[in-house]
Amino acid sequence: MIIGIGIDVVDVERFRRQLERTPGLLDRLFVPAERSLNTRSLAARFAAKEAVAKALGAPAGMNWQDCWIGLDVNGPTVQTKNTVAAVAEAQGVKRWHLSMSHDGGISTAFVIAES
């Protein structure tokens, strides 16, 4: 059963400028394994994290590093711990579905939280 869905779109150039203007933003938003990725990939991962938050009802107090985007043979995966994992567990989320895409300077992500 679908518990929640979320979608987000990020302008890659605007995201790049924000990362450049805001010291520490990269470290605040991303886990170490994500930080070395190019800006387009970071923008897609940020969109995915926003989509996860929306699928969970945008819980207050969500720590950005408690959700990260991994990769396996089937594509991108949603990984959670601490604050995000606790909210997901309380809502009965057992499985995440994630699709990310880039086109024309835009990164987008769509998430389904499933029981």
From Swiss-Prot:
Q: Which GO terms describe its cellular component?
A: cytoplasm
* Keyword Membrane annotated: no
Q: Which InterPro entries match?
A: 4-PPantetheinyl_Trfase_dom, 4-PPantetheinyl_Trfase_dom_sf, ACPS, Ppantetheine-prot_Trfase_dom
Task: Give the molecular function GO annotations.
Answer: holo-[acyl-carrier-protein] synthase activity; magnesium ion binding
Q: Which cofactor does it need?
A: Mg(2+)
Give me the reactions it catalyses. apo-[ACP] + CoA = holo-[ACP] + adenosine 3',5'-bisphosphate + H(+)
Do the record's keywords include Membrane?
Answer: no
A GO BP entry is: fatty acid biosynthetic process
> Which Pfam family, just one, is annotated for this protein?
ACPS
Swiss-Prot/TrEMBL keywords: Cytoplasm, Fatty acid biosynthesis, Fatty acid metabolism, Lipid biosynthesis, Lipid metabolism, Magnesium, Metal-binding, Transferase
Enzyme class per UniProt: transferase
For the ligand (Mg(2+)), the binding residues are: D8, E50
Q: According to the UniProt entry, what is the EC number of this protein? A: 2.7.8.7
Q: What is its main location?
A: cytoplasm
State the compartments where it is located.
Answer: Cytoplasm
Tell me the domain of life.
Bacteria
**Assigned protein family:** Belongs to the P-Pant transferase superfamily. AcpS family.
Function field: Transfers the 4'-phosphopantetheine moiety from coenzyme A to a Ser of acyl-carrier-protein.
Q: What is this protein called?
A: Holo-[acyl-carrier-protein] synthase
Recorded source organism is Renibacterium salmoninarum (strain ATCC 33209 / DSM 20767 / JCM 11484 / NBRC 15589 / NCIMB 2235)
Gene expressing this chain: acpS
